[in-house]
Regions:
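Generic structural signal for small/hydrophobic residues in well-ordered secondary structure
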Residues: 28, 116-118, 188, 194, ...
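Transmembrane helix boundary and interhelical loop/hinge segments in multi-pass membrane proteins
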Residues: 93-115, 119-120, 127
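Transmembrane helix segments
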Residues: 51, 195-230
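Membrane-interface capping segments at transmembrane-helix boundaries
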Residues: 264-274
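A short amphipathic helical element positioned immediately N-terminal to and/or at the very start
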Residues: 21-33
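Residues that define the loop-to-transmembrane-helix transition and helix capping
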Residues: 39, 120, 196-197
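Helix-loop interface residues and adjacent transmembrane-helix termini in multi-pass membrane transporters
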Residues: 33-35, 191-192, 271
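Secretory targeting signals
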Residues: 2-18, 38, 42-97, 123-191, ...
Length: 274
């Protein structure tokens, strides 16, 4: 009597493939666009950029006949065209914080770090994806804001053209500024790892610290204020000589602040437990 040996086939494990930076970026893109707060915050930033520009330009156009010659001489329409950036940066910065802190609050960050044991590619992917999405939306928004303002001012014969010196740099620079502000918020959020704390830190640095500088001696204020993130970054949107920093120098300094925040976040991400 002979026995027949039987073998049981083992189930094949799914092939997950190598974890690459591109795959991590695609995963972060899926997460970013699936979150409702992303759509609302980005929509708010676009509406603020265009809507406030239209409203501010309309108000100035209405009061233009009653303005003195001195006020008209000091007025530059581009500052009004880009007025919406002041509020849009709040939406962009807060969303930057939420991009990372929302995962900590839900515990989802553990799954992300388990899938990518090296950890750092997750933070890099968030920065890459959020930066590209912000830039892709804000460039059209600032361009539309400029066109809307230009069309309103034409009725008062206030001429401003995209070809004028510094105008193109200021308009495109506004989109670049908002993008880096978002990355700065992302870096702060990754450092704090708490939504309320991250937003408070971002708002404190960007909006509370500059007014507090006014209580310092004038010489100190004049020396330090241009180097704060808000003033330094917005130098790229200025076409007057009032700012102490040159446009690209100020923008480079803001990029340095964002890079420093992301660098500190990277170090802490490797050293701390999730």
């Amino acid at each position: 009597m002979s026995s027949v040996a039987t073998t049981t086939a083992l189930p094949r494990l799914p092939h997950t493939g190598k974890v690459t930076q591109l795959r991590v970026c695609l995963s972060e893109w899926t997460k970013l666009r699936s979150v409702r707060s992303t759509r609302w915050s980005m929509a708010a930033a676009v509406v603020f950029t265009i809507g406030i520009a239209a409203l501010a330009c309309a108000v100035v156009s209405h009061h233009w006949p009653h303005m003195s010659a001195a006020d008209r001489a000091d007025f530059h329409p581009l500052e009004v065209n880009l007025a919406g950036v002041q509020l849009a940066q709040l939406a962009i910065g807060v969303l930057g914080v939420l991009v990372i802190t929302a995962e900590y609050s839900t515990g989802m960050i553990r799954a992300s770090m388990t899938a990518v044991p090296r950890r750092l590619p997750v933070l890099w992917a968030k920065a890459i994806v959020y930066g590209l999405v912000t830039l892709a939306l804000m460039i059209p928004a600032t361009l539309i804001a400029f066109v809307v303002g230009e069309s309103i001012f034409k009725g008062r014969h206030i001429n401003i053209a995209f070809s004028h010196p510094g105008v193109a740099r200021a308009v495109i620079g506004a989109a670049l500024y908002l993008t880096v502000v978002g990355l700065f918020g992302l870096g702060l959020g990754a450092i704090v790892r708490n939504t309320a704390g991250g937003i408070a830190t971002f708002a404190g640095i960007m909006f509370v610290l500059p007014p507090l500088m006014n209580v310092m001696p004038t010489s100190w204020n004049n020396a330090a204020s241009p180097y704060l993130p808000l003033a330094a970054g917005q130098a790229i949107m200025s076409i007057t000589s009032g700012n102490h920093l040159r446009p690209w120098v100020g923008f480079a300094l803001l990029c340095g602040y964002a890079a420093a925040a992301l660098a500190i976040a990277s170090i802490l991400l490797v050293r701390r437990d999730t």
